[in-house]
Curated annotation (Swiss-Prot):
Subcellular location field: Mitochondrion membrane
Gene designation: AIM39
GO cellular component, one term: mitochondrial membrane
Swiss-Prot/TrEMBL keywords: Membrane, Mitochondrion, Transit peptide, Transmembrane, Transmembrane helix
Residue ranges of the TM segments: 156-176
Species in which this protein is naturally found: Saccharomyces cerevisiae (strain JAY291)
Membrane topology per record: Single-pass membrane protein
Record bears the keyword NAD: no
Superkingdom field: Eukaryota
Protein name: Altered inheritance of mitochondria protein 39, mitochondrial
Similarity comment: Belongs to the AIM39 family.
Amino acid sequence: MWGLCKNHFPSNKIQVQERNKALKPKKSGSEHKTKQLFPVFNCKKKEKGVMIRFAILRNANTSLLSARSICLFTQAPTYCHVRLNTLNKSITTKRNSLTESKRHVHDGKHFFTTPHQQQQTKLGEIEEGHSPNIKGEDLRSIGQAITHQRNKRRKQIWSAIFGGIFGVILGYSLIYRVIYLKEQSFLPLFPSSKIRKLSSRDLKKVDVNQVQKLSKLRVLEILSGHDMIKEQYGVPLLDKDGNSPTLNEFSMWCEDQDPCVTGIVMEPDDKRDSSHTWYRIPFVCKWRITHRPISIRGTIDDLLNRIGLETSDLFEIISPERVYGSFKYEYPLQGDSHALHLWFHGEIELDDDSLIVYNGKYHVDVKLQEIDLFRREKNGQLVQYVLYKNEAGDK
């Protein structure tokens, strides 16, 4: 553009002075039009920008192409205009982004729509003249849909959490412990009672007939020395037929020292004979349901052993009641690392109205805890007489 216009502008000071003299005394309508089309080169700062004026000599021959180029040059934006337009665009963009971010904020009341859209919907319904009943039904249906969606999502989250926990536990117990390490694994299910019946495996290790005979002898020995029995029943103690009293009922059970849980024991499927009843998954593992105690002290010992310490390094508990007959020295089942109480209960009938009831514990020898006499008196009342009670024993 400068190449087209440079020949029509004065190149020295003399030409500029001659041009000014020629333009100063004469003012006509054509000159006024020339000033409007090509203003004098004079930069005046205004509030909104810079105005550039150009003037062409009166006698100069200006082609149409050159005049058009000069007009285009006068209409070109300046640096101030470009800078101002850039700032305005950036401010407008920031305002629009803030407005859009505020519109897209979600809360508990607007699940499927934004607050702005809901306001527009309400205004449109009011302008159209919808009845409040239809509006309430719509809101109620939307609320039910939101509640259903939240409940469904909550169920999915909890299902994923429990499924992940179950998968990790089962993978560690079965895949890692049993299949990879070829070890026994115990998977606890729910708490169980500390008192339970003796299993068939336990009964093989305990001579129940011997315990029954020993308990009867100990009971008769104690009753023979009791004053009430001597006075009212005589010594030796006999039944109504004049024979030695017999046991009407005798039972045994065991009690664990620690809290117990019921769970599943899993082992590698080695097809060995066992006294337990196993359920097999071919070529994978065998499993059965059993009860196991939770030894708190044993758990602490295991944790200390892993870091190279022992319980005796920190403290030592000396309990004076841990003597013969206590939990520490009770009958241990083979293969188990915990002690058990072996309890027994028996009944001896003296006559139709008198019954001897006793209970105690067994460990190598019988240790009686209590002997009671239940007798129906002449007035028809059933009375319990405590003939013997071991105060020092743990019941």
